[in-house]
Amino acid sequence: MTVIDANGLILGRLASTVAKQLLSGDEEIYIVNAEKAVISGSRATTLKEYRETRERGSTEFGPYFPKRPDRILKRTIRGMLPYKRARGRDAMSRLKVYVGVPTELKDTETITIADADMRLLSSSKYIELGEVSQKMGSKF
């Protein structure tokens, strides 16, 4: 069991690393503090892109895009997996993403991913995933 703290980690780099780990092993991966992951780039552009993605399609036929930060992170990881095939479905079943830290994982040691740290950003432009989901109307 691996517990990853997403606090201050870049969303895409975190997602790609987790996707590789899920496909290569049989270990369950828990991600906590999903709302504190960051998306690099301009605030206005990022919010506009996520709003457009959310509003694409219809309520009847989709595509359906989540509002909550834990679901957005899980959807991002899903996009990096062959989720329509058996090994991708198995990998997704081993992934759990949480907003905050649940009580059963409070005493567990968490790890961080050095390659995904936001201090590696060359620019100071970023927005937290929790703020993006709040702007889209989430009440997490």
Curated annotation (Swiss-Prot):
Job description of the protein: This protein is one of the early assembly proteins of the 50S ribosomal subunit, although it is not seen to bind rRNA by itself. It is important during the early stages of 50S assembly.
Assembly description: Part of the 50S ribosomal subunit.
Family recorded in the similarity comment: Belongs to the universal ribosomal protein uL13 family.
GO cellular-component term (any): cytosolic large ribosomal subunit
Gene this chain is encoded by: rpl13
GO biological process, one term: translation
Keywords from the named record: Ribonucleoprotein, Ribosomal protein
Protein name stated in the entry: Large ribosomal subunit protein uL13
Presence of keyword Magnesium: no
Database matches in InterPro entries: Ribosomal_uL13, Ribosomal_uL13_bac-type, Ribosomal_uL13_CS, Ribosomal_uL13_euk/arc, Ribosomal_uL13_sf
Lineage, opening ranks: Archaea, Methanobacteriati, Methanobacteriota, Stenosarchaea group, Methanomicrobia
GO MF assignments: mRNA binding; structural constituent of ribosome
